[in-house]
Amino acid sequence: GQSLFIDGGTTNEAIARAIPRDIELTVATNSLGVASVLSDHPLVELIVLGGRYVRDLGTCVGADTLAAVAQLGADLFFLGSCGLDATRGVTAFDSSEAEVKRAMAGNSAGILIAVTNDKLATTAPYRVAAAGSISHLVVEKTAPAAILADFERQGAQIHFA
């Protein structure tokens, strides 16, 4: 089966809930919420990436998390985005969280980001990945076409949820 990194956030928890119970996957996550959702999926090999737990984020970060990520590779990274801008790329509000996201992105063959309209064309202080590194962008049907065109020009495949 396919291997995935899934980091934290409410959107990624919703994605985890949508994963069918009869699909064979390996999922590595630093999110306790995602781990909890997938814990009863019998065909999912679940790898929980430990480290310093940040309650506000619901994720583990820090040296232990980074060391675990360094030992793994994924076919696809479901990246939770705080901000997404065609010029600044993917950004996060927490430096430790951004560091883990960068490590996951660097060890993944592709990056998928699912965002709501309120995160499009916004930025946070810490850079995670360039817009051109996004393989798949999942957006609402009402997402502004001009913004989506900027991401398409940089190589992202656009999908409507």
Please identify what each model-predicted range represents.
Residues 32-161:
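Conserved phosphate- and dinucleotide-binding cores of soluble alpha/beta proteins
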